[in-house]
């Protein structure tokens, strides 16, 4: 079987490294590659996938919403989020899934076991935020708080949440047990920081879904203040592991997948 990740750009993706190591550790002859599909060519996606003999694929930026009209079916999680990151192909039928939210929450449970009673603030209101919020809402009892720069973004949300501005979130930081940044601030070593952490409580877990760099400026600042921090590496590994399960019905070797990505990040 042949799998791929599609995006624009996509050459930076660590998904091929992660999945190839997993296939090898399980003695599978399947392959996984990065397939660059420019936005202007996306209308031909069905033919491109068929011509490359792809049996299933992951979808990354900027195609997670764009793929939806080309699918034959979409599962409830992806429908709720309005974005797809995994496509399974059965007898030429394309089925869309979203494993980002569950991937993040699986990892978060390991570092914050009392998730059920946590007061959670999510920064950003894009697809990643919605996926994580949708999954957290199944576990967390207190109402989730989502902060975004523009309030109009919440018009597409169909969830029972507290919607506030980023400025408001800075005032109430000390009320939260977990703060999760889902914005692109800090990506690729830029020095942007989404909010001021001046009012941060020392007991708050501070998280960022970015894993390149391993610690964003946001996490470094929180760590400097003495807080526990948690990046997006587990989310990346777990969403890939969930995709593998969807495609093959088999259990992935998550430890090998994580080592492969860590070694690549370290330049080993």
Swiss-Prot record:
Q: Does the keyword NADP apply?
A: yes
- Give the active-site positions: 64
Q: Where does shikimate bind?
A: 13-15, 60, 85, 100, 211
Gene Ontology MF annotations: NADP binding; shikimate 3-dehydrogenase (NADP+) activity
GO terms (BP aspect): amino acid biosynthetic process; aromatic amino acid family biosynthetic process; chorismate biosynthetic process; shikimate metabolic process
Q: Which GO terms describe its cellular component?
A: cytosol
Q: Which UniProt keywords apply?
A: Amino-acid biosynthesis, Aromatic amino acid biosynthesis, NADP, Oxidoreductase
Q: Which reaction does it catalyse?
A: shikimate + NADP(+) = 3-dehydroshikimate + NADPH + H(+)
- HAMAP family (UniProt xref): Shikimate_DH_AroE (MF_00222)
**Role noted for this protein:** Involved in the biosynthesis of the chorismate, which leads to the biosynthesis of aromatic amino acids. Catalyzes the reversible NADPH linked reduction of 3-dehydroshikimate (DHSA) to yield shikimate (SA).
Subunit info here reads: Homodimer.
Recorded protein name is Shikimate dehydrogenase (NADP(+))
- Primary gene name: aroE
